[in-house]
């Protein structure tokens, strides 16, 4: 990696040539970008993207990837002509019960800051890797909570007009792991708008949001629907996530992943009834708008893909990409995986679940230059 000396063209942002992207993602897979532009402020993000989009209109630019934490990306190793723009604007401010975070802020730092200021509402989202700006794009959620529960507005750069404005959360068309941002994106490289800042309105009473998730309630030893100390909820969530390999640890290959690779499918009630009648024992399910939500991890394991799949033969080599030994939904890089290895395993699992149950799992991460 070397500096190109072109930072002045991007309002002082750092510019480097030939930068490997794999170390900048939680899956640790990806190509060497032709150019990496790191923006330390929202002003640098705006200036950089305006310039790159002007170059695009003139037909003079490479494909542009905009990212921050790299926690929800599978980038094809073939995308060697990329200009990557990394959001490193990481300011966090608190005013009363409002928490504002710039797009590049580490998400778990945002959660911890809120809790340290006595604010409840984000604690169930503790330990989720990635950046604050990415959370509204797919309406990040865990343990019965979603970003849309407390998000009031986002500050965005419209790349078509070059304008910057605040957009109310009510206009973001949130759904299960989706939003207007995700639906309008083409292939992850031609996103029409970029989140610069997010704002949350939280509970200043010193209580958590109601604990809606049974596993978390059991960990806290409280009834479902009860509120608790946000710090206690955070610690319980982190403990649950750690046991599932969902807290980043450079020494643990079970955490080299994008988290859950597939979303929990929502099916029609008759599909659920048919499934429940065809297997022994209960089928994990939850009510959802428009149908019944099934547990993707249960489907994966019941289709024959247990934790650690594919398990190496005794004394034999380990596959470069395997399911986590702790969580059946995490596809993990065992140290040498490339994007093709990840996609191949994802296809095998998707096709296997479809063959057994007639249900097609949908990938949760953004796939850049590759597809299932």
Swiss-Prot record:
UniProt main location, coarse: cytoplasm
Name of this chain's protein: UDP-N-acetylenolpyruvoylglucosamine reductase
Reaction catalysed by this enzyme: UDP-N-acetyl-alpha-D-muramate + NADP(+) = UDP-N-acetyl-3-O-(1-carboxyvinyl)-alpha-D-glucosamine + NADPH + H(+)
Underlying gene: murB
Documented EC number(s): 1.3.1.98
Stated role: Cell wall formation.
Protein location: Cytoplasm
Pfam families: FAD_binding_4, MurB_C
Family: Belongs to the MurB family.
A GO cellular-component term linked to this record: cytosol
SUPFAM superfamilies reported for this sequence: FAD-binding/transporter-associated domain-like, Uridine diphospho-N-Acetylenolpyruvylglucosamine reductase, MurB, C-terminal domain
GO molecular function terms noted in the UniProt entry: FAD binding; UDP-N-acetylmuramate dehydrogenase activity
A GO BP annotation: cell division
The keyword Glycoprotein is annotated on this UniProt entry: no
Active-site residues, as the UniProt record annotates them: 177, 260, 364
Keywords: Cell cycle, Cell division, Cell shape, Cell wall biogenesis/degradation, Cytoplasm, FAD, Flavoprotein, NADP, Oxidoreductase, Peptidoglycan synthesis
Pathway recorded for this protein: Cell wall biogenesis; peptidoglycan biosynthesis
């Amino acid at each position: 990696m070397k500096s190109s000396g072109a930072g002045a063209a991007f309002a002082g942002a750092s510019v480097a040539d030939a930068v490997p992207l794999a170390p900048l993602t939680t899956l640790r897979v990806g190509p060497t970008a032709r150019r990496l532009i790191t923006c330390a402020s929202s002003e640098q993000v705006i200036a950089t993207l305006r310039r790159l989009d002007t170059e695009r209109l003139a037909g003079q630019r490479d494909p542009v990837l905009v990212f921050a934490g790299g926690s929800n990306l599978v980038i094809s190793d073939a995308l060697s002509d990329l200009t990557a723009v990394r959001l490193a604007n990481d300011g966090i401010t608190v005013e009363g019960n409002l928490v504002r975070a710039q797009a590049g802020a580490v998400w778990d730092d945002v959660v911890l800051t809120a809790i340290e200021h006595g604010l409840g509402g984000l604690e169930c989202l503790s330990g989720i890797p990635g950046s604050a700006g990415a959370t509204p794009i797919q309406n990040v959620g865990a343990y019965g909570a979603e970003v849309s529960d407390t998000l009031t507005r986002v500050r965005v750069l419209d790349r078509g007009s070059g304008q910057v404005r605040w957009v109310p959360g009510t206009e973001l068309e949130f759904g299960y792991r989706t939003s207007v941002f995700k639906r309008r994106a083409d292939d992850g490289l031609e996103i029409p708008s970029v989140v610069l800042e997010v704002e949350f309105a939280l509970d200043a009473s010193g209580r958590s949001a109601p604990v809606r998730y049974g596993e978390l309630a059991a960990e806290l030893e409280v009834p479902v629907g009860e509120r608790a100390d946000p710090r206690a909820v955070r610690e319980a969530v982190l403990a649950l996530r750690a046991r599932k390999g969902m807290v980043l640890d450079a020494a643990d290959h079970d955490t080299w992943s994008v988290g859950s690779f597939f979303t929990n499918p929502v099916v029609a009630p008759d599909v659920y009834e048919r499934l429940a009648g065809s297997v022994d024992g209960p089928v994990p399910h939850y009510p959802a708008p428009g149908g019944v939500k099934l547990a993707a991890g249960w489907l994966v394991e019941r289709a024959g893909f247990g934790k650690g799949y594919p398990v190496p033969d005794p004394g034999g080599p380990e596959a470069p990409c395997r399911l986590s030994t702790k969580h059946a939904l995490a596809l993990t890089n065992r140290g040498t995986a490339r994007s093709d290895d990840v996609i191949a395993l994802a296809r095998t699992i998707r096709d296997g679940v479809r063959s057994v149950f007639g249900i097609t799992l949908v990938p949760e991460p953004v796939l850049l230059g590759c597809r299932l």
